[in-house]
Amino acid sequence: IDTLLWLGRAYFYSGSFLNSKDSYLEYQSMGQDHPKFADSLYELSKVLIELDENVQAKLLLDKMLTEYPGHTLSSKASALLQNL
């Protein structure tokens, strides 16, 4: 399952945003119990912003901040949300 997360990251940094989105969505479909699930919400929101899917990105960031308020990426997610 971690492979999908890393694949999503690799696609993102190579500019293959649609492939990145697909990898993150497949990763997330495997369940919220994985320790990196909150990370994937934040990272997928960045992909969606690149694809001009800002409404969906906002929803993911809101979900992340609501369900994982103490997460290490919460401040970055909050800042990203404010800039949308």
Where are the regions that the model predicts?
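Short solvent-exposed coil/turn linkers within tandem alpha-helical repeat scaffolds
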Residues: 29-36, 65-77
